[in-house]
Amino acid sequence: MRYPFWRLAVFLAACVAPVWWLYQAWIFALGPDPGKVLVENFGLATLVMLLITLAMTPLQRLTGWPGWIVVRRQLGLWCFAYVVLHMTMYALFILGLDWGQLGVELVKRPYIIVGALAFLGLLALAVTSNRYSQRRLGSRWKKLHRLVYVILGLGLLHMFWIVRADLKEWALYAGIGAILLLLRVPMIARRIPRLGGAAKAGSIKVQNNG
């Protein structure tokens, strides 16, 4: 296994936020409505983790370091873990495990449907993130995993619908998402300079001038 310490560092870093939030809820440090705070925190964490996952390929192209790609699958699975926690908190604290209330919630808050579609997409990606699925699906595997772009759009729409009174934070995440998607356009991706290559070229130029 390549980069074991890097993988471990990413794993521990991804554990910090959920453990901290659950601990805060345990000691009643999340205010009068801890359930709502947990739902919001895990929802936002899912979006942030999705953006971080999508950033791995551009970072690899920019730096030439393969370690970014090595942890991409792990980050994607953490994204799924966060969304599972998000939905678990919603079921526990918002629905109170009253599934009959879900129909009422869907009518009152249709953005839940958008979030549920994003969850199903992440579920499909998580289930097929293994080598067996890659071999089994062949060329269809890449097509399926391009669903991540649709999931990002659904996640941003879900957030937009919730926070439309104050769009500053949403605009930040939407802007980052747009940049990450643009960096995957082949014509743009080919123009991404490698920092290592640029530094090496600069060094050679200095030596030649010297």
From Swiss-Prot:
NCBIfam families membership: PRK05419.1-2
Subunit note: Heterodimer of a catalytic subunit (MsrP) and a heme-binding subunit (MsrQ).
Which InterPro entries does the annotation name? Fe3_Rdtase_TM_dom, MsrQ-like
Coiled-coil annotation reads none
Q: Which GO terms describe its cellular component?
A: plasma membrane
Q: How is the cofactor bound?
A: Binds 1 FMN per subunit. Binds 1 heme b (iron(II)-protoporphyrin IX) group per subunit.
Q: Name one Pfam family in it.
A: Ferric_reduct
Membrane topology, as annotated, equals: Multi-pass membrane protein
Give the protein name, as stated in the record. Protein-methionine-sulfoxide reductase heme-binding subunit MsrQ
**Biological processes per GO annotation:** protein repair
